[in-house]
Amino acid sequence: SYPVIKENSNNVELLIPKASFRINPGDMKNHAKTDRAINANNIFSVNRLSLEDSLESGRSLTLGLDYRNSNSENNNEMNIKLASVIRDDVEGPIPEKTTLNKKRSYIFGSVDYNKNDFINFEYNFASDNNLADIKYHDLGIGFSLNNFVTDFNFIEESDLIGSAHIIENTSTINFDDKNFLSFKARRNKEINLTEYYDLIYEYKNDCLIAGLKFKKTFYQDRDLEPSEDLFFYLTLIPLTTIEQGIDENLYK
């Protein structure tokens, strides 16, 4: 890669073109239906398909472009990535959801924006070759104010990638540098159902993490009632984690 640099007194801008050629004359196992995800952050990885028993078959050329804008303190305020894969022939054994099996894959992109400590923005997407139809959205927005941090995530999939439509939230209150209270929830808009919510208290120091977690899980099946579980867990750094469920009769 050959970066193009533009620098002034307030910021530094980098434009980095990327290219990677791969060839595998051998065969690979059939992973056409294997669930794998490609994005702008892993598309140049050596084992981007995360397969342990096969190498990606065929010949391919991965092309990409990175843009970075850093301020005078060398903090990245904005990162933009675009990448796509072209190949000379269709490769059936490659996971279909990735579209890397096609002669021209989807165009994968990401945008990260961190102007200040109060708000951050992250967007990942996958589009058809003409950038006319977005097949995948993953939008994350985070807010931080004093000891309160909350993150929202919106995921929408279509076509080969999937059919999910998810909204997630994680919120944390830091009482001090050792005591934390977190809330997590996930709603599936496709079936109009809240999948779960968690309420977690944690105590952390250099040697251990101790926590109490209440988890409520909902079900789409009308024959199954929502489940409520209370867990105590202890992590000894860096050795192991112990988790123990608490009898529901003690808290109901």
Describe the residue ranges of each PLM region:
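Outer-membrane beta-barrel translocator/pore domains, especially the C-terminal barrels
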Residues: S1-K252
